[in-house]
Amino acid sequence: MYPARLRTTWSHSVSEDLVHWEELPTALYPGEGDEPDASGVWTGSVIYGEGRYHAFYTGYCLTAEYQQTICHATSEDGITWVKDAANPVITPMIELYEKLDWRDPYVFYNEEDKCYWILISARRLDMPITRRGCIVLYRSKDLVNWEYYGPIYSPGHTNCPECPEMYKMGDNWYLSYSRFSEYVNTIYRVAKSPFGPWRKPKKDGIGGRRFYAAKSMQDDDGRRFYFGWAHDRADRSDRGEWYWGGTFCVPHEVVATEDGGLDVKLPKEYEHVFEKHVDWDYIPVLGNAELHGDRLVEMDSVSTCTYGFLGHSEESYMLKCKIMSREVYDHFGILLKSDKEASGCLLLEFDVAMQRVSLVNLPMGVDPFWVQSCQAVPPATEPGPDGVRVCEKTFDITEGSEIDVCLLYTSPSPRDTERSR
């Protein structure tokens, strides 16, 4: 699965509303023989400048001296692309950086520096081996001749900062990238200058742990959206082996806050899709629960655990609710894709003691003795929710306060299932 997925193309899709997408002809295919992109056309970026479109991408070639290099293609209409005969246009500086990781170029015009910038993911030779990941800067006046500047960010916490990009919102500059480490995530840093220094905000994640390799764009109204990928799993099972690559996620919108942070929220376009009210029933399973009218469920879990299910017939829906907790010192949450025993499911968990919101895959690993002693629980086999959003801002889980929850669930189409194979 892994080697086959490396020989990627650049697919091209467009949308007017972030929900409905039209596929256009494939923009770039891998090369042949010993060409620098013969083993795959990896990620990069596109800019319109100097009278035409320019794509800078990672050329991958297993048989080349430098397996990962920066390649270039141009287009007059953004649809049909011609590769640069001079490819690769930027190769690793092996006296300073490793050969292996030299990729993920991000190009933009820096108004403050009055030239084009290109950011490259790399690994410094003068750093500890698992902490060498850095972002290297080149500059150009014409998108053809590039001058080396040096590492613009070396966090010392990652093997490689994948898919970096930089942009300005308000008075702040933002540098985002996907952290390839044991703490995998798409994260961001903030600075007053594009040259740094880059500071870590209190909450630096864009999306959850599996919202990865995310790249953003800004529309004509100044709204910025991140487009990322959720790793898929073998057999489309929540218990399957994690694969490299994955499924296109619901876009995430980011909004700058007064303190320089980024709030992440669901684009309003998705809420407009689910405008029809869905009738539902509460089906109690365990504990003490009472339905008030047709909109309020009250649960009393003193000395017990209380849960039940919402009965309805929809395959794709949006669940919006308010949760108010009282005298809760453990956790509460929402079960997703659960069996009746709530033993094989996903749990959107609000942990009061830890002040943490998590999407937990149950059952979790336990001591081997208990695994052998307990009844076997079949794993969930259906794909998980497309996206989960918990409020739009950082919040405290406190007694008597309301928590707004918005959750999307869409069943995969047969075409999506076929694509995953």
Language model regions located:
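Short, solvent-exposed loop/turn segments at conserved positions within beta-propeller repeat blades
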Residues: P3-T8, A64-Q68, P128-G133, S181-V184, ...
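Beta-propeller blade signature
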Residues: S11-S15, I70-D77, C134-K141, Y188-S193, ...
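Short, aromatic/His-centered strand-loop micro-motif at the edge of beta-sheets
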Residues: P368-D404
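Conserved small/polar residues in nucleotide/adenosyl-binding loops
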Residues: Y409-D416
